[in-house]
């Protein structure tokens, strides 16, 4: 049976981890959200989130975006390539409802899977 936990080892925790992804990322994005990815040598994917107060003013909206993004990652973690991902929320992401945000994330995860197979 597949485990769908979201443990500490599946998160980017230090600034060095984020910098690693920002240096040479593969990009997949929509006008509201961008996912940067870079292959890692760990054998499993990891995720980091950046939801700036400048782009999403209200704390409950930032929390909702982060919660939905983590849940989307948690459910797809076994299909994703061994990459470090940084999800960057842009202006307008707070205007998306939960379903639209989830669908956008699914589309971006699939695009990253295709990009990883191509490289």
From Swiss-Prot:
The keyword NADP does not apply. It catalyses: Endonucleolytic cleavage of RNA, removing 5'-extranucleotides from tRNA precursor. GO terms for biological process: tRNA 5'-leader removal. Keywords: Endonuclease, Hydrolase, Nuclease, RNA-binding, tRNA processing. NCBIfam families: rnpA. RNaseP catalyzes the removal of the 5'-leader sequence from pre-tRNA to produce the mature 5'-terminus. It can also cleave other RNA substrates such as 4.5S RNA. The protein component plays an auxiliary but essential role in vivo by binding to the 5'-leader sequence and broadening the substrate specificity of the ribozyme. Belongs to the RnpA family. The keyword Hydrolase applies. The gene is rnpA. Consists of a catalytic RNA component (M1 or rnpB) and a protein subunit. Its EC number is 3.1.26.5. PROSITE patterns: RIBONUCLEASE_P (PS00648). It is an enzyme of class 3 (hydrolase). GO terms for molecular function: 3'-tRNA processing endoribonuclease activity; ribonuclease P activity; tRNA binding. This is Ribonuclease P protein component. InterPro entries: Ribosomal_Su5_D2-typ_SF, Ribsml_uS5_D2-typ_fold_subgr, RNase_P, RNase_P_CS. GO terms for cellular component: ribonuclease P complex.
